[in-house]
Amino acid sequence: MRIEIAIAVISDLHIGSTVALFPDRYALPDGQILRASTAQKWILGNWNNFWSEFHGIRATRKAIIVNGEFCEGVHHSTPQIVGTAELMEEIAVEVMRPHVAKVDELFVVKGSGAHSKPGGFSDEAVARELGAKRCPSFGTRSSYRWRISAGGVMLDCLHHVTGSGAPWTKGNNLRRAVLEHLYTSMERKERPADLLIRSHVHAYGHWEQSGCHAYVTPSWKLADEHAHKIAPGSLLPIGGLFVLINRGRAEVIPRLYSPQTGKASTL
């Protein structure tokens, strides 16, 4: 059965991090070969499975939403990176190009300044190279916010969302996002979105209120040194979302891939 619209939603690729999505092999201009680690090969395998499933969906129109942060960037003196921000952008283009070529539109949301450069210029550079859709307000290839009307379904896409780190406060960030959105939409006399897409914190979540569904997307990055500090012991799944739209209704399918806990040592 062919549906009207299929959208793949991904975010926080963090390409350039030593613990994030990376090609199996990448040749630098000077001839040095960078190769994916064992962990990165696991991420890449799931990435390939995600896209194989998405490209197999029969739809009249297809799109990709990258909800911020193609690249890790050079930040906070971290040693867990592979090179310059510009190199990361080149790798991101190579990783994304085969999938962008198979869809009708690419929408790019700007991420945080730490990863995406001030003003989101890293996301903008990759978006421009990939021919992403222009923002109707500013003419740029990326934007901090996208409101997308797709087959009668309104999506509201922003990279940032507040955190909800402790298990007993899980979901508070989504509840806040939905209620703030509904309130401000009412104040502005705007139509509330059917789907809120948020990212940044890498922890998948979903909450619904009054027909407004909010989702936080997972990332394509495992825990780095900073994550081990602020959330010790956490094992967040990686992955993305499929949004399938037919007859004015949306079905959101999360695709989550969970890393395994490390083997225990024997005394």
Q: What positions do the PLM features span?
A:
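Short catalytic/ligand-binding loop motif for oxyanion handling, primarily in non-cytosolic enzymes
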Residues: G16-T18, E72-H76, H115-G119, G165-A166, ...
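An acidic, phosphate/nucleotide-engaging active-site surface
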Residues: K117-L158, T162-K170
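Conserved beta-sheet core of the metallophosphoesterase superfamily
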Residues: G151-D156, V161-R255
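Residue-level marker for buried hydrophobic side chains located in beta-strands
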Residues: I7-V9, I64-V66, V108, D156, ...
